[in-house]
Amino acid sequence: MTRVDFSALDTAGLNLQAVFRLAALPGEVAAALDPEGRHRRLILIGHGGRTLWERVKAAGLATEHPIDEFTRARVAEWLAAQLPGVAHELVYPGDTPVGLQALGRLAGWHHESPFRVGVNADWGSWFAYRAVLLVDADLPESVPQAGASPCTTCPSQPCVTACPASALSDRDFSLQKCVAYRRQQDSRCRVTCVSRTSCPVRPEHRYDDAQIAHSYSRSLAMIEKFY
């Protein structure tokens, strides 16, 4: 059994890690990510809270995708230090389709929220998936994060009533209403999500306004391109 130290990733703000045995994942997941069966483990890497953005800003990356570039660099450094010479493949960020939320559910990180962003009791909705790494090493598997969805003990669900698009008013998310409202020039959700910022779970981990604007500007660009 090969043991590794994730502390360098923690310091970089990539403070969520889950190790899966590829052979134990649902067959369609393993087949899509590692069709030739060349690796033994999948490492899901994420971030929770504000530290990653602070590290990215300090790195001064003036690129279109600074978080992805920072993540690739830190993961490469970690691999060189912890698993030198081990065969590996970084499938995300990249062009390979990856079911990030499905992996998040298996890790115990992801519970569905009314506003369709994953939520958990430790970080609220203020976490994200940053890398999916395949390695040919016999790493110890992670124990899934325990705990039920915090939404089950939130009877008032202020995220529903806060949505200015009424996209959650029927207790089911309306992508059409959300997209139509975000496209409006005077929309309160062009570079944020009012429902998400109204969620009362772990507000101390909320991203700063610049990080929120960065993320939602990217999603708005996709909306304006494809809708």
Residue map of PLM features:
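Non-ligating segments of multi-cofactor redox enzymes
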Residues: M1-Y227
